[in-house]
Amino acid sequence: MHKKLYLFLILIFILPTHFVHSNTNNTIKEDQSTLNILNNYFSKKLLVGKANFQFLFWNMYDAKLITESGKYPSNKFALILKYNKDFSKKSVVDETINQLEKQKTFNEPELEEVKVLLNRAFRDIKKNNKFIGIKNNDEAIFYFQNEKVLKTDNSEFINLFFDIWLRKDSQNPKFTKELLGKNKG
């Protein structure tokens, strides 16, 4: 009788405590294809933060920021965007250029280079499509629907591109704060 009671108390009080401690907020849940891509660049994959971007009443996309430490800033991170509606390639490229121009005034040759890079990085987007941007020190690698679509070492482009979502004075400070994990209690 005492053995059964002792075993019951262990199961009720001790084991759940262990599971609570091992279930951290920064574990990531992704499909296997995304995990395979991330495994090529990260030994550990910890969630810094996640956010949902909405414009008026449209649910545009969900974003996650991943690093090996679970902290940002980092020289190595992944930004994952899962789209919640369809977008044309042209509209995504145009809006991305608009966001980049809020950070820098481009001369004509610079703007043409940016357009070339963005046209290589983006495709027509369907609901639930996934875009992964990985900053790996001095280079960036972009995946669309598990296909590597762009690799660049253009540091200015890399920083401006990721700063659309990550800079302190972004267009949507609440979104950026959530993505950077600043809303954790």
PLM features: residue spans?
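Classical Sec-dependent N-terminal signal peptides that target proteins to the secretory pathway
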Residues: 2-24
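Terminal leader/tail segments of proteins
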Residues: 21-144, 148-185
